[in-house]
Amino acid sequence: MAKLTKRMRNIREKVEVTKEYDINEAVALLKELATAKFTESVDVAVNLGIDARKSDQNVRGATVLPHGTGREIRVAVFTQGANAEAAKEAGADLVGMEDLAELVKKGEMNFDVVVASPDAMRVVGQLGTILGPRGLMPNPKVGTVTPNVAEAVKNAKAGQVRYRNDKNGIIHTTIGKVDFDAAQLKENLEALLVALKKAKPTSAKGTFVKKVSISTTMGAGVSLDQATLNTQTN
C-alpha cells in the first residue's frame, strides 16, 4: 500500500490539474509516470458538448487508428458460405454459425470482437443476453454487422476502436500503449478526434469537443491543449 501512496504522491507532484498540456509534453509526462510492471495502455477521455439524455445526440461509431492499439485482437465471425471463406482469409480466428453460437452459450468466448453478416443475425440475435453485457453484440453502426465481413475482420485486426458516449457525454477509449512513440500516439488521437467530429449530431449545439485528457492504465489524467492537435475534418 505504501508503494501505491508513493506513486500517487509522485503523480500529484508532477501533474498540474488545471493545466492544459501540449500533446508532446503530455505524452512525455505519461511515459515518465508509467511505472507499472506491465506495458500500460494510453487511454483517452473526450468530453462532448451533447445532452446524453437525448437519443438523437448520442455518439457511437468506430474508426481504424493509423498505428493500431498495440493489442492483438481475436475476431469471431458469424457467417456462412463464401463469406466464411473470405473471413478466414482475412484472418478471422473463429468462423461459424450454430456451432459458434454453441461455444458462446457454453461460455467459451476467446475473442475480443464479434462480426456478423446480415443473414447470420437470426443466430446471433439469440445470444444478445450473453454478448450484449460484454459489449460484444454486433451492430451496423460500428460496422460489425455487414455483408463485407472480410473488411470488418481486417479493420478489427488493424486496430479499429469502437466508441460510444456514456451517460455524462464522455467517450472513453484507448489510443495505444505507453511504449508507442509520441508521434504515433498523437496521430492515433488526432484520427479519433476527426472521426468524432465527423460523427457530431446535427442537433448538438455549441462547442462539440469540450475537453480531451489522456492517461495510462494506472495513472492520472492529463488535460490536453487542443490547439496542439491537428483535427481539421476537411
Swiss-Prot record:
Gene Ontology biological process terms from the UniProt entry: regulation of translation; translation
InterPro entries: Ribosom_uL1_bac-type (IPR005878), Ribosomal_uL1 (IPR002143), Ribosomal_uL1-like (IPR023674), Ribosomal_uL1/biogenesis (IPR028364), Ribosomal_uL1_3-a/b-sand (IPR016095), Ribosomal_uL1_CS (IPR023673)
Keyword match tRNA-binding: yes
Gene3D superfamilies: 3.30.190.20, 3.40.50.790
CDD domains recorded: Ribosomal_L1
One Gene Ontology cellular component: cytosolic large ribosomal subunit
Superkingdom: Bacteria
Record keywords, A-Z: Repressor, Ribonucleoprotein, Ribosomal protein, RNA-binding, rRNA-binding, Translation regulation, tRNA-binding
Presence of keyword Phosphoprotein: no
One function term, GO molecular function aspect: rRNA binding
Family: Belongs to the universal ribosomal protein uL1 family.
Quaternary structure, from the entry: Part of the 50S ribosomal subunit.
Described purpose of this protein according to its UniProt entry: Binds directly to 23S rRNA. The L1 stalk is quite mobile in the ribosome, and is involved in E site tRNA release.
Xref: HAMAP family: Ribosomal_uL1_B
Protein name, entry field: Large ribosomal subunit protein uL1
Source organism per UniProt: Aliivibrio fischeri (strain ATCC 700601 / ES114)
Name of the gene this protein is made from: rplA
